[in-house]
Amino acid sequence: MNIGVIGVGKLGEFHTKLLMEIAHDSKDVHCAGVYDLNTERAEEMAKKYGVASFSSLELLTRSCDAAIIATTTSSHYEIARTLLGEKLHLFIEKPITTTIEEADELIRLEKENGVHIQVGHIERFNPALRAVEAHIGRPMYIQAERLSSFSRRVTDVSVVLDLMIHDIDLVLSLIPSEIKNIAASGVKVFSNELDMATARIDFVNGATANVTASRLSRNRLRKLRFFSDNPKSYASLDFATGKSEVFKLVKQGEASSKNPLKSFAARKILEQFGEIHENMQGMVLDYIHPEVPKTNALRDELEHFINTVRNNTPATVSSLDGRRAIMVAGKIAEEIAANAAIRE
């Protein structure tokens, strides 16, 4: 399987490096080379990793069975449409496109040409999330915060498509219900697109998600909190540090055998909720500190893409998943624009 990398900026270089590692460990995977509009950058990366530098997208296409698109979001559609027409399997960095119409066309071409698209919503492969998935149950309230500093590198899209899209995808994957209502607000500060946004998403099944994203923070923050009713539990994830904690009600005798309560915060919370032991007959509050595997989420999702192509199996993050994420992102942007018009 010959795979090319399109766009070798910071993220594209990560893809190239990991693809080379995967190719080294595999008998049927080969990095065919790289392509970038910045030819100097492409040649620099090609020399660094010992691969070909293609002078055009057409030349790369002729040498590949699949490709990784790690270019700016606004260019995803045109590049993907061209490659799908040549029957290439595609890994497209998130978001899949900027509009529903573009996503629908890519999905049509994917089906028409019998190929696979996987969208790079990397947090689905985050080891911290995977460590707590078995304990989450049915989330009825999710709180997500994703903050970063301002970067001129990403100003072609709003913070909703740049950062919030990660948590939109996670929320949609964790709450299996149609959306009932969306309320949102946001502001433009240093760019012509939204730099800060917050949204409340209400679902038909009664679940709610509050999602906040900003690229105006001095410090990075990537946290997710779940409150579930079946089983009754609370889970906290810090994607930046890879740490996770779970508190849940269990029957007497079913508490985790690995319950060292090393965290002072955990001990304090159990003390605060001590009355639960008295009010919930036969139930105790258990603390679980899941062991988070030391894996590379980007490598994991690339390997999943390769296996999807190799075995002709569905992608964990499909083109339809990518479409749904940008559909919700679009509704959030529309709600923010409507609120801004009212203020004016």
Set out the residue ranges of the language-model regions.
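Conserved acidic residues
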Residues: 32, 65, 140
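C-terminal helix-rich "cap/oligomerization" subdomain common to oxidoreductases
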Residues: 59, 66-69, 290-292, 299-344
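Rossmann-like dinucleotide-binding domain that binds NAD(P)(H)
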Residues: 152-219, 223-227, 239, 320
